[in-house]
């Protein structure tokens, strides 16, 4: 079984989405299909076909979330030993050595990644280049814009 690392917040968000899909979206789509069936000929019934397509997307997402939750490896960074090392779940402050610009990122699971909110996937190039390093270490990371050197300023376990 594949393991899916996620923070407690990411796990809760997936559970909430699953609940929404099962208790709100699925019944709404089922009702829409039933209503569209009442309109007669299903071959040329656009409402029916649209609702069936929506049902397929909904059921696929439910299966995807259930698989991820069954393989979830919930890691709470607040409970990790505070060794100053970059690991999954921590928030890391890094400085671009060329521009001296500092950035703050939390390393999270794939489903939690949100670059606009400074949450990067554990599988992203930046996270892969930082994992295992400690405060004060430098990391050379290949980004889409080229090779960038960062210094790890601070590792926060929260």
Curated annotation (Swiss-Prot):
Cross-referenced InterPro entries, in alphabetical order?
A: GreA/GreB_C_sf, TF_GreA/GreB_CS, Tscrpt_elong_fac_GreA, Tscrpt_elong_fac_GreA/B, Tscrpt_elong_fac_GreA/B_C, Tscrpt_elong_fac_GreA/B_fam, Tscrpt_elong_fac_GreA/B_N, Tscrpt_elong_fac_GreA/B_N_sf
Q: Keyword Ribosomal protein, does the record have it?
A: no
Alphabetic keyword roster = DNA-binding, Transcription, Transcription regulation
Among the Pfam families in the record, one is GreA_GreB_N
The Swiss-Prot or TrEMBL record annotates one GO molecular function as:
DNA binding
Q: Which GO terms describe its biological process?
A: DNA-templated transcription elongation; regulation of DNA-templated transcription elongation
Entries under Gene3D superfamilies matching the protein: Transcription elongation factor, GreA/GreB, C-terminal domain (3.10.50.30), Transcription elongation factor, GreA/GreB, N-terminal domain (1.10.287.180)
Q: Enumerate the SUPFAM superfamilies for this protein.
A: FKBP-like, GreA transcript cleavage protein, N-terminal domain
Identify its protein family. Answer: Belongs to the GreA/GreB family.
Q: What does this protein do?
A: Necessary for efficient RNA polymerase transcription elongation past template-encoded arresting sites. The arresting sites in DNA have the property of trapping a certain fraction of elongating RNA polymerases that pass through, resulting in locked ternary complexes. Cleavage of the nascent transcript by cleavage factors such as GreA or GreB allows the resumption of elongation from the new 3'terminus. GreA releases sequences of 2 to 3 nucleotides.
Q: What is this protein called?
A: Transcription elongation factor GreA
Instruction: Please name the source species.
Output: Psychrobacter sp. (strain PRwf-1)
| UniProt lineage | Bacteria, Pseudomonadati, Pseudomonadota, Gammaproteobacteria, Moraxellales
